[in-house]
């Protein structure tokens, strides 16, 4: 980690912090996620190892790319490329919602990235605006895989996890331990309306209140989930809310088009078995009308290539700067040597000092013409110029090799932004920027940004119930995170 210069704190949370750093060799700006002393905290170690393992396996244009992993003094360090903009930033800048074309491009990439994870039997489990990054070119990146995991084998159950309540599917809220990919699809449905309208769809302030919001919009839970709710000791003495009159999506958001409402409804089906797969969502009319999917797929590849070129140009610029600094230092060194040499030959002392004060070229001509032997000596004493080549190979400081030679994309795990050090970029055409009024997003999210390590506990307008659920699990602990050895990088082409 000595090769990185710390430029300041980006954010911090319960499990660690993220720092903005510069690679001293290449000048490249990166984000380094530093976990707490994971050897002393089993939960921190579990989260760190899970994120490292999954990010090493997954390589996709819409997923954050892990550049390097180090372990120093019982702490894990994850090195990512630096990006300081998320969809949450867009929603705070444009509280009335984003433009149709922007939402269309964002959702296409979000579903594309989640679908890639699902094709490798991995569920993210914490999809939300602050975990979706956006590069300067508009490339979306899913990040923060600390709660992601592989799908359970038949008969195996999942352990409970702490994720953002507003985007939890009903099966998670009632304590079902046999959930699957459908929980990510539910979160997509929540994002659909939030990006268009600028407000969260189900802003519950407790698990039972969250269920109330869901049932008010979508109706009663399926029988299996009702049974799980009644058997869950956390809800002992509590009944599911009785819904006298529903407020469906089309009534709540009359300005949204039918195709948008239909996309959201499909993702938010109360029965997880009836929610579509990501591949089906990409063929929805919302993406297929006017040839958007085919046209944007080509545009996306150009955006990815542009980001890669920007990284390459940045490296070359830094290298040229460092070589210029070396050249300047050599000139100063030569001047010093020439001045020292005049002490041995007083007859030419005044002449040499006069030439040194002149231009660099004049000084070199004088040396070549009048002091050939001295110039030869200086030539031998020069430091050779070594070209600095941006390194693409990854080295684990804990003797774990990582080989990543592909062009990395630009991403950073999100944490609370320190706006004094990091100013988010604003994409044009995003929407109409207004001065935020006092409300749930201003009260809770203007603390500079969200902290993904510390899950939000914001209040809902209804606030009818106030009971949190914790799933009771009797199954064995996860085996995929307990290993102390860092897994080898596996590229997915």
Swiss-Prot record:
The keyword Nucleotide-binding applies. SMART domains: S_TKc. Its EC number is 2.7.11.22. Pfam families: Pkinase. One of its GO terms (cellular component) is nucleus. Expressed in testis and kidney, and at lower level in brain and lung. The active site is at residue 126. Residues 363-384 are annotated as: Disordered. Residues 4-287 form the Protein kinase domain. Signal peptide: none annotated. It catalyses: L-seryl-[protein] + ATP = O-phospho-L-seryl-[protein] + ADP + H(+); L-threonyl-[protein] + ATP = O-phospho-L-threonyl-[protein] + ADP + H(+). GO terms for molecular function: ATP binding; cyclin-dependent protein serine/threonine kinase activity; protein kinase activity; protein serine kinase activity; protein serine/threonine kinase activity. It is found in: Cytoplasm; Nucleus. Disulfide bonds: none annotated. The [NKR]KIAxRE motif seems to be a cyclin-binding region. Belongs to the protein kinase superfamily. CMGC Ser/Thr protein kinase family. CDC2/CDKX subfamily. This is Cyclin-dependent kinase-like 2. It comes from Homo sapiens. The lineage of its organism: Eukaryota, Metazoa, Chordata, Craniata, Vertebrata. The gene is CDKL2.
